[in-house]
Swiss-Prot record:
SUPFAM superfamilies: Winged helix' DNA-binding domain (SSF46785). Keywords: Coiled coil, DNA recombination, DNA-binding, Meiosis, Nucleus. Plays an important role in meiotic recombination. Stimulates DMC1-mediated strand exchange required for pairing homologous chromosomes during meiosis. The complex PSMC3IP/MND1 binds DNA, stimulates the recombinase activity of DMC1 as well as DMC1 D-loop formation from double-strand DNA. This complex stabilizes presynaptic RAD51 and DMC1 filaments formed on single strand DNA to capture double-strand DNA. This complex stimulates both synaptic and presynaptic critical steps in RAD51 and DMC1-promoted homologous pairing. It comes from Rattus norvegicus (Rat). Residues 118-182 are annotated as: DNA-binding. It comes from the Eukaryota. One of its GO terms (molecular function) is identical protein binding. GO terms for biological process: androgen receptor signaling pathway; estrogen receptor signaling pathway; homologous chromosome pairing at meiosis; meiotic joint molecule formation; meiotic strand invasion involved in reciprocal meiotic recombination; positive regulation of DNA-templated transcription; positive regulation of nuclear receptor-mediated glucocorticoid signaling pathway; progesterone receptor signaling pathway. Residues 93-153 form a coiled coil. This is Homologous-pairing protein 2 homolog. Phosphorylated by PKA, PKC and MAPK. InterPro entries: Hop2_WH_dom, LZ3wCH, WH-like_DNA-bd_sf, WH_DNA-bd_sf.
Length: 217
């Protein structure tokens, strides 16, 4: 046996006794070994020996169930608890349980919000996306203008296709603008300055800044 293991074994009775008194619940030798092994480096033989020694000295109680022995602290050493104290503890437990449940629910809401925010576009990505959409919208607006001006060269089917595409991109424009607005609002909830200052700091330009109006459907 190594020196450190021997020292741990010598102090095992005190460690085991203190553990059983602090926990004040029944344990098997395997339970005590599993719970103390990592922190104190106790071997199973040392734990079993300490439990038997403490039981023989009357410092802990021992019960045999079939082939298994159960050990627990001597209850005579603890103060008697009144019914009023028990009821008070029950009330405290219920209050703390309700508080924990409320905190857990808040954590779930915050995790859901965080997941939504992390899956959304970043500010630079939004800026790039907005610029691309503006360019794309300008191209289609110009194309539509030319098509309207040259009705003799456009079939009804082509005209209908262009109108459908226009409706599609207008819908996408509204959708992305709404997403951007919601994301900015979520960020602004924890932002110490005004919305205008936030937009100036990150370089966000709105449709209104350029007098751009979303076309009618």
């Amino acid at each position: 046996m190594s020196k450190s293991r021997a020292e741990a074994a010598a102090g095992a009775p005190g460690i085991v006794l203190r553990y059983l008194q602090e926990q004040n619940r029944p344990y098997s030798a395997q339970d005590v070994f599993g719970n103390l092994q990592k922190e104190h480096g106790l071997g199973k033989a040392a734990v079993v020996k300490a439990l038997d020694q403490l039981a023989q000295q009357g410092k802990i109680k021992e019960k045999t169930y079939g082939k298994q022995k159960i050990y627990f602290a001597d209850q005579d050493q603890f103060d008697t608890v009144s019914d009023a104290d028990l009821h008070s503890l029950d009330a405290s437990i219920m209050a703390l349980t309700a508080k924990v449940q409320g905190l857990q629910q808040s954590c779930r809401h915050m995790e859901a919000e965080l997941k939504e925010l992390t899956s959304a576009l970043t500010t630079p990505e939004m800026q790039t996306e907005i610029q691309e959409l503006k360019k794309e919208c300008a191209r289609y607006t110009e194309r539509l203008k030319n098509i309207k001006a040259a009705t003799n060269h456009v079939t009804p089917e082509e005209k209908e296709k262009v109108y459908r595409e226009r409706q599609k991109y207008c819908k996408e424009w509204r959708k992305r603008k709404r997403m951007t607005t919601e994301l900015c609002d979520a960020i602004l909830e924890g932002y110490p300055k005004s919305k205008k200052q936030f937009f100036e700091e990150v370089g966000i330009e709105t449709d209104e800044d350029h007098n751009v109006t979303l076309p009618n459907p």
